[in-house]
């Protein structure tokens, strides 16, 4: 059996602002949008789900079944994989958008991780190959 990641979820107050933030930063396309969520294509390998905080606590009937309730509070951490050659470009992009890189880590096994916060305070990491055994 094989398993891989498909979706990453963040819970936000400002759906429109968060959608614009991630589109501007990563150039991702919005796949689905409604009053409670946005689904965005991240690198053709993952879907970033932006849920309106509190908007999914009742679950939802959809064609083909029922999506159970879910929600989260506080700051969440997520990591996106980037190529080593793109680190400086992402540093420039973040700087141009006045997004502070709050930490840069060089793990002992190699690679680089850039950490910053999104509009809602979530901790976002951009990591190059070598940061861990599987990447």
Please describe what each predicted stretch is.
Residues 118-124:
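Short, contiguous alpha-helical
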Residues 18-23, 94, 121:
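Conserved active-site tyrosine of GNAT-family acetyltransferases
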Residues 1-6, 29-83, 89-117, 130-135:
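Vicinal oxygen chelate
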Residues 127:
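Short metal-binding segments enriched for Cys and/or His
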């Amino acid at each position: 059996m094989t398993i891989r990641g498909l979706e990453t979820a963040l819970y936000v107050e400002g759906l429109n602002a968060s959608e614009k933030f991630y589109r501007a930063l990563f150039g991702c396309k919005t796949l689905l949008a409604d009053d409670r969520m946005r689904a965005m294509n991240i690198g053709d390998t993952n879907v970033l789900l932006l849920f309106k905080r509190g908007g999914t606590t009742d679950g939802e009937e959809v064609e083909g079944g029922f999506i159970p309730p879910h929600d989260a509070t506080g700051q969440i951490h997520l990591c996106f994989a980037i190529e080593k050659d793109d680190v400086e470009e992402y540093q420039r992009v973040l700087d141009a958008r006045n997004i502070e890189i709050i930490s840069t880590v060089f793990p002992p096994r190699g690679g680089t991780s850039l950490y910053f916060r999104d509009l809602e305070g979530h901790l976002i990491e951009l990591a190059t190959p070598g940061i861990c055994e599987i990447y």
